[in-house]
Amino acid sequence: PLGGARPHDVVLGVSIGPYADTPADLRVDDYKTLVDHFATLADYLAVNVSSPNTSGLRDLQGAPLRGLLAAILEERDRTGTGVPLVVKLSPDIDDLAAVVNAAEASGVDGIIFGNTTIRHQEGRGGLSGAPLGSSALRGLEQIRGRTGLPIIACGGILTPEDAAARIDAGATLVQLYTGLVYAGPGLVRKTARALQRRPPAIR
């Protein structure tokens, strides 16, 4: 159980999002309920507004974003935990600058970029892995040029070299998903060690 003992040197992030059948005007309540449930258990919470698998969810990255995040942050503050709250954005956003500005203005603690892309010809659903790499990297560079918030980069990171490229582009941290399928869980340690051996970046 999450409430039980777990290694203290492992960072636990929990991604939160609404149920697929929750009406759009009530989705904020789902987020707030999940904040209440996980605030004392997680090291950080990720507000997922970018999953392509929930109809209409990505619409929250538009005009509603700032108000949504403000409401979720208010609920976080009510818990008294101070757990960091980050927002996970899609790589398919057209006006990325406006979305980043809204996220920063809301008071979130960081940004995860990006989720899977639906701009592909491979049928329905989100596409991840290597095909996402170049667009995710370009978006990361744009975000870093707009904000000083911590950025967790994901999308198309399959090797230590991919991770290093994200750090060089301004990422604070990286996340791995598809790479684990092809290289196994050892990719995490291999990547971490490779990054530790790199000389400090000059900015």
Predicted regions mapped to residue ranges:
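Alpha-helix-loop-beta-strand connector modules within alpha/beta enzyme cores
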Residues: 1-9, 61-85, 126-151, 191-202
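Active-site entrance/lid segments in N-terminal catalytic domains of soluble metabolic enzymes
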Residues: 1-106, 120
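Hydrophobic faces of well-ordered beta-strands that scaffold small-molecule active sites
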Residues: 12-16, 45-48, 85-87, 111-113, ...
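Glycine-centered flexibility sites
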Residues: 13, 17, 110, 125-129, ...
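Catalytic cores of alpha/beta
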Residues: 29-32, 93-106, 144-147, 157-174
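Glycine/Thr-rich beta-alpha phosphate-binding loop at enzyme active sites
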Residues: 51-62, 98-145, 149, 183, ...
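C-terminal helical cap(s) of enzyme catalytic domains, especially alpha/beta-barrels
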Residues: 120-129, 167, 178-203
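Recognition helices and adjacent regulatory flanks at domain boundaries
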Residues: 133-136, 153-165, 175, 180
